């Protein structure tokens, strides 16, 4: 049923893309798909920290599972753009949806995608990015890339750290079988990048990483794996060899 609903909502989204240019209807359809995905997976969700939401920001979170994306779409009450590795645009159906809904690809160089992301922010469109670039294989927090910090500094737009809790236990990367359980998204306080220069992107990345780990640790419940922290930002801006 999960894969059937994904196909149905995907077809609806592609059809909607023929009648709009801003992707708003497609985003609404994606949100319906996301909530149905969590329901089929047996994963009631909770959102903590809604008071920290901003109209325009660079939203970021840890990345532990394929179910992270449904949780983010179900939890954020507004349209946003996703930055993801360009290789996803080569996938049949998924790539078509990403392209038609206005999501932003980032290649190995990263500059074109990052510049497009900055323009989207300045036009009033929030962004969402997984700073780890790909899903964790063991539940541990991976090294963060500096792309989100770079974008926030360039655009002078706040970073909002978020922790996704329970999705790794719900559907780890090495299985296709759901393990029904509650999940939650915790939204942290915005980080103002105005005191940082581009040369301090690594410093801001480290702060972002610390904030997400702190949110996760403080709100994790029984049975939730507590991740450790990688030591340094990646040289790459966003690209990763791991699957989203």
What are these regions (language model features)?
Residues 1-46, 93-100:
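A transmembrane-helix-recognition feature enriched in membrane-embedded lipid enzymes
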Residues 40-42, 77, 95-98, 154, ...:
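Short, well-ordered coil/turn elements that cap or connect secondary structure elements
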Residues 111-244:
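Non-catalytic C-terminal accessory region of glycerolipid acyltransferases
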Residues 43, 103, 156-157:
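Short glycine/serine/threonine/alanine-rich loop segments
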Residues 61, 83-85, 107-108, 131, ...:
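Thr-Gly-centered strand-to-loop micro-motif
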Residues 66-116, 121:
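Membrane-embedded segments
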Residues 30-80, 84:
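Conserved H-X4-D acyltransferase segment
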């Amino acid at each position: 049923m999960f894969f059937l609903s994904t196909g149905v909502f995907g077809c609806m989204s592609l059809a909607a893309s023929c009648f709009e240019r801003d992707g708003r209807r497609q985003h609404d359809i994606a949100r319906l798909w996301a909530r149905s995905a969590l329901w089929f997976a047996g994963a009631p969700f909770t959102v903590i920290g809604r008071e920290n939401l901003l109209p325009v920001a660079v939203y970021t979170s840890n990345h532990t599972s394929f179910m992270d994306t449904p949780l983010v779409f179900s939890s954020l009450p507004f349209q946003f753009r996703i930055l993801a590795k360009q290789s996803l645009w080569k996938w049949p159906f998924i790539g078509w949806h990403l392209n038609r809904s206005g999501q932003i690809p980032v290649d190995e160089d990263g500059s074109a995608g990052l510049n497009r992301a900055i323009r989207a922010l300045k036009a009033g469109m929030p962004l969402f990015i997984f700073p780890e670039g790909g899903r964790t294989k063991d539940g541990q927090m991976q090294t963060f890339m500096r792309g989100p910090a770079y974008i926030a500094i360039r655009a002078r737009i706040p970073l909002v750290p978020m922790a996704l809790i329970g999705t790794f236990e719900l559907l780890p990367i090495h299985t296709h079988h759901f393990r029904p359980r509650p999940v939650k998204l915790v939204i942290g306080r915005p980080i103002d990048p105005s005191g940082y220069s581009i040369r301090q992107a690594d410093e801001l990345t480290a702060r972002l990483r610390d904030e997400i780990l702190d949110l996760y640790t403080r709100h994790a419940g029984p049975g939730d794996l507590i991740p450790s922290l990688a030591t340094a930002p990646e040289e790459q801006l966003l690209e990763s060899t791991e699957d989203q």
